[in-house]
UniProtKB/Swiss-Prot annotation:
Protein's name according to its UniProt entry: Protein YIP4
Known role: May be involved in proper membrane localization of Rab GTPases.
Residue ranges of the TM segments: 91-111, 118-138, 154-176, 180-199, 205-225
Gene Ontology molecular function: small GTPase binding
Cell compartment(s), UniProt: Membrane
Superkingdom, taxonomy of origin: Eukaryota
Protein family per UniProt: Belongs to the YIP1 family.
Biological process according to GO: endoplasmic reticulum to Golgi vesicle-mediated transport; intracellular protein transport
Native source organism of the sequence: Schizosaccharomyces pombe (strain 972 / ATCC 24843)
Membrane topology: Multi-pass membrane protein
Keyword Ion transport in annotation: no
This protein's GO CC annotations: endoplasmic reticulum; membrane; trans-Golgi network
Amino acid sequence: MTDIGKHNTEIEQDEMENLLRMDPVRSSLDVESRAIEPDNIAGESIVETRFTGGDSLDEPIRVTLFNEFRAIGEKLVYVLYPKNAQVLRDWDLWGPLIFSLVIALALALSTDKIERESVFTVVVALIWFGEAVCSLNIKLLGANISIFQSMCILGYSSFPLMIASIVCAFVPLIFIRIPVIVAMYAWTLFAAMGVLQNSNLSNKKLLAVYPLFLFYFSLAWIIFL
C-alpha cells in the first residue's frame, strides 16, 4: 500500500508540473523570477520592443490626407482617360463616397426645403445599393475582381454624373440640361466599362453591361428631374 501511495503521489506531482508548465501566468512569473537572479543579470540583457505600427499609422495627419487625395486624383485620371484599369485594382471607397454625397446634396438643394432630407437620404441609398447590386452581378458572372474593386470602379465612374448634377442644380434651362446629362451619361458608361476589362467575362459582357446601363440611366433620369 505504501508503494502504491508513493506512486500515486508521484503521478499527481507530474500532473501538477504539467499544468503549471501550460499556465501562461505561471510561466511569466517563472521568467520574471529567473530574470532577477544575479547570474541572469550579470550574463544577459533585456531588450524591450514596441510595435511601431505600419503603413500610415505613424504618418502625420497632413501626410495621410495628402496621400489619400493623391490616390483619389489618380483614379479620377482613369475616369478621364480609362485605359489603365489596373489603377483601380488598389481600391478605396473615399472617392465614391464623396461623389455620392455631392450628387445627393446637389439634388437636395434643387428641391423644396421640406423634401431635402428625404431626397438626400434616398439618393445616397440608391447609389450605393445600385453599385453593390451591379458589383455582385459582375462577381457572380465569374469576374476575377472582388466586389469592392468593382464598387470602386463604378463609384469613380459616377464622377461625370456628379458634374451633371451640379450643372443641373444651378442651370434650369432644359436645352442646356439635356445635352449635359446625355454627354455625362455616355462618359460614365464609357468609364464604367473598365470594370469589365481583363475580368474574364468575354462571353457574358452583355449580362454585366445591362444592369450598369439601367443603374446609370436611373441616376441620370433622377438628375434630370
